[in-house]
Design a protein with these regions (language model features):
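Extreme N-terminal tail/first-helix region
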Residues: 1-13
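Conserved acidic
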Residues: 6, 43, 80-83, 87, ...
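Short, contiguous alpha-helical
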Residues: 11-15, 19-22, 30-74, 113-169
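Helix-adjacent hinge/juxtasegments
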Residues: 60-94
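Proline-centered turn/helix-capping motifs that create local helix->coil transitions or kinks
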Residues: 99-108
């Protein structure tokens, strides 16, 4: 059947920015993708794990499914350079399947904020959404903004890691 045009646009934009982060890992080894520009900064593998976890969590909860997201574990960098691509593709398939269950009517419906984690957080969560009622569309647009922000973050981190840890040095 295919997605409604607005949902297809949302999917395309979200996946474009997720793919930008995944592409920042291309050609790098596990040491490079785990490198942090600052002790308190995020590595490339943390960025992709976190953005995919956040996007998937938002979309599946908007269609009423349970999420087992553990946001804190995203910052422990559980993926490797080799596993990242398959993890990203699996998450994109789950996101696409959930988006298929939305329509224009559900985009306009008010929705409670998606639960951030299945347990209390130790890594603080920051929301850029203003107070007041939010629609499913608001949360999807926030997911896109979040992915885009971290895509730029990942591209800068990739350039820094190449300078700090040249491959083969």
């Amino acid at each position: 059947m295919g997605l409604a045009p607005e949902l297809e646009s949302i999917r395309r934009r979200l996946f474009r920015d997720i793919d930008r982060i995944a592409e920042a890992l291309d050609g790098l080894d596990d040491e490079q993708i785990a490198w942090k520009p600052l002790a308190t900064g995020s590595s490339l593998i943390v960025l992709i794990t976190h953005v995919v976890g956040s996007a998937q969590n938002t979309v599946v909860q908007l269609v009423g499914d349970e999420s087992s997201r553990d946001r804190d574990s995203e910052f422990l960098a559980p993926w490797t350079a080799q596993s990242a691509r398959s993890e990203v593709e699996a998450a994109k398939a789950r996101i696409s399947a959930a988006l298929e269950r939305l329509d224009a009517r559900t985009l306009d419906a008010e929705h409670a904020p998606p639960r951030v984690s299945s347990r209390p957080l130790t890594v603080p969560s920051v929301s850029t959404l203003s107070a007041g009622p939010k629609t499913s569309r608001d949360f999807l647009l926030q997911a896109i903004a979040h992915a885009a922000e971290h895509a730029g973050h990942a591209e800068l981190t990739r350039d820094l890691v190449r300078a700090a840890l040249p491959k083969g040095s």
